[in-house]
Amino acid sequence: MAFKLASSPHLSTKAQTRGLMFKVMLCALPGALAQCYFFGWGTLIQIALAIAIAVATEAAVLKLRARPVGKTIRDNSAALTGLLIGVAIPALAPWWIAAIGVIFAILVVKQLYGGLGNNIFNPAMAAYVMLLISFPMQMTTWVAPSGAALHDLGLMQSLSVIFQGADAEQVLAYRAGIDGVTMATPLDAVKTGLSTGLTLDEILTKASFSDGFGIGWALINLAYLAGGLVMLKLKLIRWQISTAILASLFVCASIGYLLSPDTHMGPLLHLFSGATMLAAFFIATDPVTAATSTRGRLIFGSLIGLLVYLIRSFCGYPDAFAFAVLLANLCAPFIDYYVKPRAYGHRASR
């Protein structure tokens, strides 16, 4: 009888990739639904489009590589990548933004390295950075959240903006003759305001910060936090990376705020703005691209938190998680090499 030897690591576990990925997607659902509530149909369209293109791209590449298509597609890893890209891009971004990003993530970042388990960078974050650098206008034009906007684009209007290239302002002008469709994210608004000489208190008095965090963003982060806590409860992820990210970011932001409260955001604004909770629980915890040991995960997460604070405070990209995660991915092998668990039976040399 012939036995087929699978590639390492040879781990015994009852958990299957398909089930794990599906549970992660379910845990991300509260945050995704919160985004749909605040940013409208566009977010749902982007998610559906990104997942469909991700699965189709994965199937096409597997076919070209003469690899089994059905089994790999059913592991839900491509669908999860599509979901993460779908919630990361602006709700009314053109359809080709999602298409280019997803194809890049699956084809270049994942499959060219050998597929799931072999990629060295997080596919969704690598795609996000590529899109942000290549198409800054489309990637930084966010629809105003519900409560700050003077509009309520329906499903057909959102489809028109995304697929036919109609301008959201033109759609509203046609419907009601009003403006106010797009606006900066809270982090972008703070960065722009500080660059013009405003103090943080002056920036936070604007209508878009009526709840102190930016309309909608705090609740979106709370929804992702709730999903992340469920993942911890189900033991889908380890606690070290997420905890280290949030603790590191909180400490760095607290120090900066204490030293200069007029020019540095407070720790709570850092924690509940942008993609903080999404990245801390659903992106940085990717077991393929993160450090593996217990101490290594703590260092890995702390590095991400530090990088996020530095990039948000002193660089040109306010929501810095994509860059921070990719830089930490580069450091993960180095961290694993120097932070090794002691081998069983090891004796210190005399």
UniProtKB/Swiss-Prot annotation:
Keywords: Cell inner membrane, Cell membrane, Electron transport, Flavoprotein, FMN, Membrane, Phosphoprotein, Translocase, Transmembrane, Transmembrane helix, Transport. It is an enzyme of class 7 (translocase). GO terms for cellular component: plasma membrane. Its main location: membrane. One of its GO terms (biological process) is electron transport chain. The chain crosses the membrane at residues 36-56, 89-109, 124-144, 212-232, 239-259, 265-285, 298-318, 319-339. The modification FMN phosphoryl threonine is found at residue 185. It is a multi-pass membrane protein. It is found in: Cell inner membrane. Its cofactor is FMN. Its EC number is 7.-.-.-. Part of a membrane-bound complex that couples electron transfer with translocation of ions across the membrane. Belongs to the NqrB/RnfD family. The complex is composed of six subunits: RnfA, RnfB, RnfC, RnfD, RnfE and RnfG. This is Ion-translocating oxidoreductase complex subunit D. It comes from Shewanella loihica (strain ATCC BAA-1088 / PV-4). The gene is rnfD.
